[in-house]
Amino acid sequence: MNKRGIIILCIIATLLCIGLGANFYFMYYLNAEEGQLASVRALENMIRHKIRHLKPAYLNRNPRFFMFRNKLLKNYKQSAYENASVLWEIANWWPHENEIYPLYDSSMGQLLKTLREEPITRASNLARGTQLKLLLRLSQQQKVIFKPQWYPRDIVIEGVVYSGKDRHVAEVYAFYLGAVLDLRWTPIVVGRVVNLKDEIYAHGDQELQNTIKIEVDDEGKETYCLYGKCHYCNEEETICGDEQHNIEGVIIYIVPGTLAKRRSPWQRTYKEDKRAVWEDDMTYCKALKNKMETIRLLDLIDVAIFDYLIQNGDRHHYETREERVVLIDNGKSFGNPYKDHLDILAPLYQCCLIRKSTWDRLQVFSGGVLTEIVDRLSKQDALYPLITDKHKRGVERRLLVVFAVVEYCMDKEGDKMFKTL
């Protein structure tokens, strides 16, 4: 065979090798991807099976509930106060690491009433972030954040889990839920009806006043509409007062101290055509266990359980205070009462770890009493009822899923999944 023929044969052989290699590569990763998706589906099926066969203890009321209920109801009952400045000092002294307020303190009821009633002395835009917020000053120059209402209680937010604007009542519900579950990592929040004309515009700085439209109809009647200043704020989307210029919203007590912002290991891509690695890799947590402190991992698992109950799938970043995780910004919750986005629980079912204290506390509120106690605690709030019955049923349904996932993990890991850190 001449030299030219040998060269042609070599080229053909090389092309065949490349083709076979590419085919092997493609098939390997296709099979791997199919295997990952199959493992996700298998997990979902396993959890459904576990839910159907949950022990009666998860379905019935825990006798210990009544002891916790009475203490909580007493602690969070709003009560009269005399000196707001003293309460501000107490609340600023409360935080320790990520615990924003104590388990029980007689001043809590007074503080809630203070946040609801103290007059607004100054208002300005709070431009940071994607959502409309205002920075208010109450008596004694105490700063608080105000988030206004965008949606009625019964709206169903369609689409992906992070769709829509913030739901203001979700912040109040998160506060009470955190208190019940002893995850006292949220800011203290109360509902409040404010007057857009007399309390916000009248006490607003020039920049805020420039983001409030005043429309006058043919009869000379004024309507005040706020659009504010933020990443997504614009003049086409406004919040308008009613006939008395009132709007609903929530007052969020600003957590004292320095907060550090960190990217969540379970962050979504926020692209419909691209999934994050953790969404398909059920072994994702194995590497995290080697590079993340166990206490931080346990914090994030607590957060995942909390977020799953209220369906907050938008915690792309999380904040820490003194190196412990806090639950800031809970507004993207309670979007669709009919959907349960299981992947919010990924930290739990991928790591199969949970604090023993968290697990014990969850079981106290079995049998439908979790939403019952939050409902009773929030009865004095200005925005009661905070959520609809459909959303309450959703919370109770998801608590059963949490129980089922822990049972699934116990089958895999046994008692070593429970940690005391």
Task: Annotate each predicted stretch with a short phrase.
Residues 1-421:
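Phosphate/dinucleotide-binding and metal-coordinating scaffold of catalytic cores
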